[in-house]
């Protein structure tokens, strides 16, 4: 429903609202402290984060969300600035279209990470989660020929690490770290695979 859509759009809108038409990064390449704090408050990170939540290099939930926004094509980083993409500007005022645009870019990563993300989406859509999901993804990746650098089968922890950017994006859309709604994660995974209209 619309409540789910608004919740799923919340983290991405928080980043887009903070960045506005574009912002200059610090000399070290981070978001300015005021914007980090704004994003942390808008996404609920400040409810559980220990510390000020105003430096991106020390506030990993905000840093990861910004990186995810770049990976799913909402932000573009170039020449010391970060700006919303044309796609982001087109959907920013429309939560459903924004969520659909993000889901269309899942899974995230390259190589085995993308495959881990795909199989994690399939598992989540089928209602799997946690250790069961990680073990299943590891087995599928191993069956498909992926190996560690040492040549051994992939572990559940390695499969989870590969799928993590995709899993984290879904968790942030389903209420965030401390308030994740597992049923919404399942619905979002299905929407990522089959389209938002098929599951909303």
Regions found by a protein language model. Give the residues of each.
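Leucine-rich, amphipathic alpha-helical/linker segments
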Residues: 1-19, 95-143, 200
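Short, amphipathic alpha-helical interface elements at domain boundaries
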Residues: 1-58
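Charged, alpha-helical interface segments at or near domain boundaries
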Residues: 52, 60, 64-72
């Amino acid at each position: 429903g619309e409540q789910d859509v608004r919740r799923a759009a919340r983290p991405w809108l928080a980043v887009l609202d903070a960045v506005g038409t574009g912002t200059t990064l610090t000399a070290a390449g981070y978001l300015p402290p005021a914007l980090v704090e704004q994003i942390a408050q808008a996404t609920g990170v400040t409810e559980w984060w220990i510390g000020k939540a105003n430096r991106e290099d020390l506030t990993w939930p905000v840093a990861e969300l910004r990186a995810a926004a770049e990976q799913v094509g909402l932000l573009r980083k170039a020449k010391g600035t970060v700006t919303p993409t044309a796609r982001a500007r087109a959907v920013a005022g429309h939560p459903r279209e924004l969520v659909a645009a993000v889901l269309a870019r899942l899974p995230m990563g390259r190589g085995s990470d993308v495959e881990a993300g795909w199989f994690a989406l399939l598992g989540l859509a089928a209602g799997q989660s946690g250790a069961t999901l990680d073990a299943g993804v590891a087995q599928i990746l191993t069956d498909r020929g992926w190996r560690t650098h040492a040549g051994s089968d992939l572990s559940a922890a390695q499969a989870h690490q590969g799928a993590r950017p995709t899993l984290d994006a879904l968790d942030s859309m389903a209420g965030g770290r401390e308030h994740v709604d597992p049923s919404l994660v399942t619905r979002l995974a299905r929407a990522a695979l089959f389209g938002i209209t098929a599951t909303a």
